[in-house]
């Protein structure tokens, strides 16, 4: 752990490998620490799937680490940032895999990443994969609706979108007027349309028609 915290990832990896025989007789607490460190090393090396598997194993073995939640959140951020880079470089298939992994880390909270995974899969022309993602989005009634905080700039007369904290703060100034909260449009109609289009792409016009009728 000291080597890893000092930034010596390779040193930490080598130490784990050279200590393999010691871990064969180690207690559960020590083994959990080993699993956690291995997960951190995988994350640092961008082996995201392996990192998630080890963090999951750590939690399943009742491992305790005060930084666990923050570390998993950081893992999610690392995965998403890597997927953004992949999309920018047109590595859509790789991006889709990572975004789906980000969704799996916390399906209740990270539904947006499933939506983006579906989109990346379409761009990768992996239609059967994208279809499975869109069908899952439909199944969980994902609408992607978010709240927007809007105000009109007194200087320009144009609407601007603010963060929630800016929205609350700027109300105390005279720089903006016409403060309002609005919801974005539902993404569900787009999801249904994409399901139908993919069925057409796959040559199943009957299911395409059925999807539209729903």
Label each PLM-derived region with a short phrase.
Residues 9, 48, 92-93, 127, ...:
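TPR-repeat structural position
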Residues 17, 24, 53-56, 100-101, ...:
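Alpha-solenoid helical repeat scaffolds
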Residues 21-30, 61-72, 103-108, 140-188, ...:
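Flexible helix-coil transition and linker loops at the boundaries of alpha-helical arrays
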Residues 38, 82, 116-117, 195:
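Structural register within alpha-helical repeat arrays
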Residues 3, 42, 86, 120-121, ...:
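Residue at a conserved register position within TPR or TPR-like alpha-solenoid repeats
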């Amino acid at each position: 752990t000291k080597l890893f915290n000092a930034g010596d990832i390779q040193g930490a990896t080598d130490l784990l490998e050279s200590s393999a025989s010691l871990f064969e007789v180690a207690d559960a607490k020590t083994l959990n620490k080993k699993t956690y460190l291995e997960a951190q090393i995988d994350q640092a090396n961008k082996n995201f799937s392996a990192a998630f598997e080890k963090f999951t194993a750590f939690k399943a073995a009742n491992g305790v680490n005060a930084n666990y939640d923050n570390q998993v959140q950081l893992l999610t951020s690392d995965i998403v940032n890597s997927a953004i880079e992949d999309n920018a470089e047109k590595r859509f298939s790789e991006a889709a895999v990572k975004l789906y992994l980000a969704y799996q880390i916390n399906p209740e909270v990270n539904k947006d990443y499933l939506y983006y995974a579906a989109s990346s899969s379409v761009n990768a022309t992996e239609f059967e994969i994208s279809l499975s993602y869109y069908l899952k989005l439909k199944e969980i009634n994902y609408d992607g609706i978010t709240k927007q905080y809007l105000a009109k700039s007194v200087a320009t007369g144009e609407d601007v979108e603010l963060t929630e904290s800016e929205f609350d703060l700027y109300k105390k100034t005279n720089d903006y007027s016409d403060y309002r909260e609005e919801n974005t449009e539902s993404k569900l109609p787009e999801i249904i349309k994409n399901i139908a289009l993919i069925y057409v792409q796959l040559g199943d016009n009957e299911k395409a028609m059925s999807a539209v009728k729903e």
